[in-house]
Amino acid sequence: MEYNDILIAPVLTEKSTELREQGKYVFKVAPKATKIQIKEAVRRLFNVKVTDCTVVNVRGKTKRLRYKEGKTSSWKKATVKLAKGETIKIFEGA
């Protein structure tokens, strides 16, 4: 799996913005990606040192549209903690 295929998108929410102050960054990642692959992808793509990585599988929610019920897709969320003093520039401009 390529490094660009592992990290799909950054997660920009109020909670993830607060975590940034602690040196933690949140990404939407590929469903089959492992913690080791995620750490390596962040290290290679952003040239930072990763100290910790936690992963959560987010279940899809049931939604209704008029008379039909549907379900949003499930996805995988990774929270990556960087070494002290390290930052990812792409988040600082957001």
Curated annotation (Swiss-Prot):
Keyword Ribonucleoprotein in the entry? The reply is yes
GO MF term set: rRNA binding; structural constituent of ribosome
Annotated Pfam families: Ribosomal_L23
Write down the InterPro entries for this protein, in alphabetical order: Nucleotide-bd_a/b_plait_sf, Ribosomal_uL23-like, Ribosomal_uL23/eL15/eS24_sf, Ribosomal_uL23_CS
**What is a single cellular component term in the Gene Ontology annotation?**
ribosome
Instruction: List the Gene3D superfamilies.
Output: 3.30.70.330
What keywords are assigned to this protein?
Answer: Ribonucleoprotein, Ribosomal protein, RNA-binding, rRNA-binding
Name a single GO biological process: translation
Family as reported in the entry's similarity comment: Belongs to the universal ribosomal protein uL23 family.
What is the protein's known function? One of the early assembly proteins it binds 23S rRNA. One of the proteins that surrounds the polypeptide exit tunnel on the outside of the ribosome. Forms the main docking site for trigger factor binding to the ribosome.
Assembly: Part of the 50S ribosomal subunit. Contacts protein L29, and trigger factor when it is bound to the ribosome.
- What is the name of the protein in this document? Large ribosomal subunit protein uL23
This protein's species is Treponema denticola (strain ATCC 35405 / DSM 14222 / CIP 103919 / JCM 8153 / KCTC 15104)
